[in-house]
From Swiss-Prot:
Alphabetical keyword list: Carbohydrate metabolism, Cytoplasm, Isomerase, Magnesium, Metal-binding, Xylose metabolism
NCBIfam families named among the record's database cross-references: PRK05474.1, xylose_isom_A
Catalysed reactions, as listed in the record: alpha-D-xylose = alpha-D-xylulofuranose
GO biological process: D-xylose metabolic process
GO MF entries: magnesium ion binding; xylose isomerase activity
PANTHER family: PTHR48408, XYLOSE ISOMERASE
Oligomer and partners: Homotetramer.
Details of cofactor binding: Binds 2 magnesium ions per subunit.
High-level lineage: Bacteria, Bacillati, Bacillota, Bacilli, Bacillales
Needed co-factor(s): Mg(2+)
Name the UniProt record assigns to this protein: Xylose isomerase
Thermoactivity: Optimum temperature is 85 degrees Celsius. Active from 60 to 100 degrees Celsius.
Organism the protein comes from: Bacillus sp. (strain LW2)
Length: 441
């Protein structure tokens, strides 16, 4: 049955359009550089927020109006698949993502859970045969059920470690079967509340053992998708071990895992860690670890993960700047790990939200491309660091000096003259480029 029968396929109508159910800036076939927008942006729908989210919060029950919610159990799971692929087709979106429990309910036993998953994966596989929408990534939910109260791979209970491994094993089999481009690990419960009851070294060692086993099993079954770590500093756990890109990178390097993983970077997780979105993207990029993106934004006045749809054009521009500098996202994409606000409870709000996010990143792509083409920031940065291309600076970079030679050089210096960083001028240029793209017809 149709679930969005009052919605037509969303088309590009251009900036002058007043149609709220049309793209104003995202034209999938438009070339930006040597790729189309669709190839650059690789948009993805998050199954959990879009099809299972009910709008509930700590202060109120679910209020979302969803046509499929008249069903329950496995009938509900099947209805969600039907609704999802109708949504994908009408939005003309190339990818989707899910956790295992998003697509099928857990059973009384692990075997029953596997059975439920198999039934729904069969159904998804059939839909994918005639759909352009592919699986960007899947993952195992290792945080919702009470068994994971003390963590999954970092749990103090070895039985929980084993159960988590079984879920990831099944998840990797599903990833291979559905042709997933990536597989994600997000450790929402991998951390601690207090050191008074925590063996941190054992927990970190066990987390590494767990990830090595996952790498080994992926090789065993021939799954060649990219493994992704998704950093987050807190929520639900006070001290999470994958706090930010730098922390997670140190972990991967320490345990010999760096060659097998890249990062799935979420904008709102960056701000929770006290960073900008583009900071986390830059750290990952310069270390060759930028794999995929969870596209959303947080509310700077709130201290939690609000998962809003991305509409901040400065943020999307600076994010796309890093992504283009990275040569794209490879097998990754821009997954809308975002939810409509509790007050936006009607089905069509799902379309308005995704259109807003897709248009915002389309603008960001075009602005970032022009900034890079015109070398707006590159030229300034090259001039700013010019002292390292000649004289003593070049010797520092080439590693041909020591403290003795540097001291001798410093003793010969007079008053050192620095130059302005011109931050305000550069922000004005960013504004100019953004406004020019938005004003273009």
């Amino acid at each position: 049955m149709p679930y969005f029968d009052n919605i037509s396929t969303i088309a590009y109508e251009g900036p002058a359009s007043k149609n709220p159910l049309a793209f104003k800036f995202y034209n999938p076939e438009e070339k930006v550089g040597d790729k189309t927008m669709e190839e650059h942006l690789r948009f993805s729908v998050a199954y959990w927020h879009t099809f299972t989210g009910d709008g509930s919060d700590p202060f109120g029950a679910g209020n979302m109006i969803r046509p499929w919610n008249k069903y329950s159990g496995m009938d509900l799971a099947k209805a969600r698949v039907e609704a999802a692929f109708e949504f994908f087709e009408k939005l003309n979106i190339p990818f989707f993502c899910f956790h295992d429990v998003d697509i099928a309910p857990e059973g009384e036993t692990l075997k029953e859970t596997y059975k439920n998953l198999d039934i729904i994966v069969d159904m998804i596989e059939e839909y994918m045969k005639t759909s352009k929408t592919k699986l960007l990534w899947n993952t195992a939910n290792l945080f919702t059920h009470p068994r994971f109260v003390h963590g999954a791979a970092t749990s103090c209970n070895a039985d929980v470690f084993a159960y988590a491994a079984a879920k990831v094993k099944k998840g990797l089999e599903i990833a291979k079967r559905l042709g997933a481009e990536n597989y994600v690990f997000w450790g929402g419960r991998e951390g601690y509340e207090t050191l008074l009851n925590t063996d941190m070294k054992l927990e970190l060692d066990n987390l590494a053992r767990f990830l090595h086993m996952a790498v080994d099993y992926a090789k065993e079954i021939g799954f060649d998708g990219q493994f992704l770590i998704e950093p987050k500093p807190k929520e639900p756990t006070k001290h999470q071990y994958d706090f930010d890109v730098a922390t997670a990178l140190a972990f991967l390097q320490t345990y010999g895992l760096k060659d097998y993983f890249k990062f799935n970077i979420e904008a709102n997780h960056a701000t929770l860690a006290g960073h900008t979105f583009e900071h986390e993207l830059r750290v990952a990029r310069i270390h060759g670890m930028l794999g995929s993106v969870d596209a959303n934004q947080g509310d700077m006045l709130l201290g939690w993960d609000t998962d809003e749809f991305p509409t901040d054009l400065y943020s999307t521009t600076l994010a796309m700047y890093e992504i283009l500098k990275n040569g794209g996202l490879g097998r990754g994409g821009l997954n809308f790990d975002a939810k409509v606000r509790r007050g936006s409870f009607e089905p069509e709000d799902l379309f308005y939200a995704h259109i807003a996010g897709m248009d915002s990143f389309a603008v960001g792509l075009k602005v970032a491309h022009r900034l890079i083409e015109d070398r707006v920031f590159d030229e300034f940065i090259e001039e700013r660091y010019k002292s390292y291309t000649e004289g003593i600076g070049r010797e520092i970079v080439e590693g041909t000096v020591d403290f003795h030679k540097l001291e001798a050089h410093a003793l010969q210096l007079g008053e050192i003259q620095n130059q302005s960083g011109r931050q305000e001028r550069l922000k004005t240029l960013l504004n100019q480029y953004l406004l020019e793209v938005c004003a273009a017809r």
